[in-house]
Design a protein with these regions (language model features):
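Small/polar residue-rich beta-strand/coil "junction" motifs that cap repeat-based extracellular fibers
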Residues: 47-65, 360-369, 373-413
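Extracellular "leader-to-stem" segments immediately downstream of a signal peptide or signal-anchor
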Residues: 2-141, 146, 150-197, 253-256, ...
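Structured C-terminal portions of repeat-based eukaryotic scaffold domains
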Residues: 345, 352, 360, 365-370, ...
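Right-handed parallel beta-helix
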Residues: 142-149, 190-203, 216-227, 239-257, ...
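Short loop/beta submotifs within extracellular cysteine-rich repeat domains
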Residues: 4, 105-106, 335, 354-355, ...
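A structural signal for short secondary-structure junctions
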Residues: 319-321, 331, 341-343, 353, ...
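Extracellular beta-strand/beta-solenoid scaffold signature
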Residues: 92, 97, 130-135, 156-187, ...
Length: 496
């Protein structure tokens, strides 16, 4: 019985060992299978990365030099020369024409077809163009044009722009001058969500860079504009054109150019509303930025386009009486800001170097809702130029604050003044004429009278406020300290 029991137990042990070995082999096989599956997935992803490698795209636009791959169109496939030796205008225009025919049933703004994010890929090439690259007149939206150089040929028309967005339905769109109405009125939108990215536009001293008319939500990002004679970027009507991370200059320079006094052209001209210019450098042009519309925002811009001494203007705010503009955190490098009858304009957190300043130019003599605060100014102490100056008379001034700025080598100007006058006598004169911005305008004043060594109350009063001078007099002679605070702030309708 014992022998039989041991025999049964032995068989059970062998069976159990065999079963365990089988299970171990099965687990290893499953684990191996999972590893192979993951390896296969990784290999597939790697092949996909290789298939869409930028180097592969640069080597060949598509299989056998195809014109497109998916929804990406290649001007090289249309006969464009990426080496920049042969004329490529027609190739790029053909690629654009085909891209604008890839339309979905979706619309963006009314009448603007959604093109589904089609891309015109310049593939890092340099393309010589003899005529403007004008987007199809049919209009459209959701398009990207990226990655290359457009170079104007010797025969490029000097009154046109390298890239143009305008429809024949836009009134006056073919007039690319900078004439403008008093009010910007939109008549229709034909292009929307068009993105220009990583493009160098070299106008070869013939015409301008990009011309945009009656378009909405256009992005010009990380682009370089060079050798323009009219405008680097000109926008008419429409709204919400975003210009960011761009460099613009008529001449290649990093400052101190011997030919600076001869710089011409305008880097950015916006005859449009609700636009933003962000993180942009303007290194050579007669005028850096012209703002002719309302509700525009300029922030983080460095202007050293042409020194004020040579007649240059950094930022020109036009549309007198309707400006509604914000200029924030800008670096005005030897070139300043001119504002025509500014209304609701905000200039803050800026740095003005090399006697760069702010000039208020009178058109109808109005300034309202102007804030110039928290800026730094640096200039030549031998000149001591004012940080803010007036060009003309301003009889209509209200809600203006120029304060909390600091200056080194320049004269502070403010709409708020504080002075302390000491003296032994009957009259104390606080002269604010070298401090206050507007002449002969003190809207509010306060004063305190401290008589030293006197125990009795003395009669004293303000006897005159004129020509930005406050006079305080006492009934009897006394050794006193008089502190006076004034401001030029008034609200509409306030009687002074």
């Amino acid at each position: 019985m014992d022998t039989l029991g041991w025999s049964c137990k032995g068989k059970q042990m062998k069976l159990l060992s065999t079963l365990c070995l089988f299970l171990i082999l099965m687990v290893e096989e499953v684990s191996c299978s999972m590893r192979l599956h993951k390896l296969s997935e990784f290999h597939a992803k790697l092949q996909q990365r290789v298939a869409y490698s930028p180097k592969e795209d640069l080597a060949m636009p598509g299989p056998n030099g195809a014109k497109k791959g998916g929804r990406v169109f290649y001007p090289v496939g249309y006969g464009g020369d990426p080496a920049g030796t042969r004329e490529s205008s027609e190739a790029i225009l053909s690629a654009l024409s085909d891209a604008f025919q890839v339309q979905s049933k979706q619309q963006m703004l009314p009448g603007v077809s959604d093109l589904g994010g089609v891309v015109i890929d310049l593939q890092g090439g340099t393309y010589l163009v003899s005529k403007p690259i004008r987007l199809p007149a049919s209009g459209g939206g959701n398009v990207v044009i990226e990655g290359g150089t457009l170079l104007a040929s010797e025969t490029f028309p000097s009154d046109r722009h390298l890239v143009e967005l305008w429809s024949p339905n836009s009134p006056g769109a073919n007039d690319q001058s900078t004439s403008y109405p008093k009010m910007v009125e939109n008549v229709g939108i034909y292009y929307e969500d068009i993105t220009f990215r990583d493009i160098l536009l070299d106008s070869s001293f013939r015409g301008g860079g990009i011309y945009v008319v009656d378009s909405a939500r256009i992005r010009i990002t990380d682009c370089f504009f060079l050798h323009f004679t009219t405008e680097g970027i000109l926008v008419k009507r429409g709204h919400e054109t975003l210009i960011s991370g761009c460099f613009l200059g008529q001449h290649s320079t990093v400052g101190g150019d011997p030919g600076e006094r001869n710089f011409t052209g305008t880097a950015i001209d916006l005859q449009s509303n609700d636009n933003a210019i962000t993180d942009v450098v303007i290194f050579s042009a007669a005028v850096g930025i012209v703002l002719r519309g309302q509700a525009n925002m300029v922030t983080g811009v460095h202007c050293y386009n042409k020194a004020t001494f040579f007649g240059g203007i950094g930022i020109l705010v036009k549309l007198a009486g309707l400006s509604q503009t914000r200029l924030d955190n800008c670096y005005m490098d030897y070139t300043g800001i001119i504002m025509e009858d500014p209304v609701q304009v905000h200039v803050t957190n800026g740095f003005f170097l090399g006697d760069a300043s702010i000039v208020l130019k009178s058109i109808n003599g109005q300034v309202s809702g102007l804030n110039v605060v928290n800026n730094m100014f640096a200039g030549d102490p031998q000149h001591m130029n004012p940080i803010v100056a007036l060009d003309g008379q301003f009889p209509n001034v209200n809600q203006v604050v120029v304060d909390s700025n600091n200056a080194n080598g320049m004269s502070l100007r403010s709409t708020v003044g504080k002075l302390t006058v000491k003296g032994n006598g009957t009259k104390w004169v606080a002269d604010f004429s070298s401090i206050l911005l507007f002449p002969n305008q003190i809207n509010h004043f306060q004063y305190s009278f401290y008589s030293q060594g006197e125990t009795e109350f003395l009669k004293h009063a303000v006897t005159n406020v004129s020509n930005n001078v406050v006079v305080v007099e006492s009934e009897t002679a006394v050794n006193a300290i008089v502190s006076v605070v004034v401001d030029q702030y008034s609200t509409p309708g306030e009687v002074i």
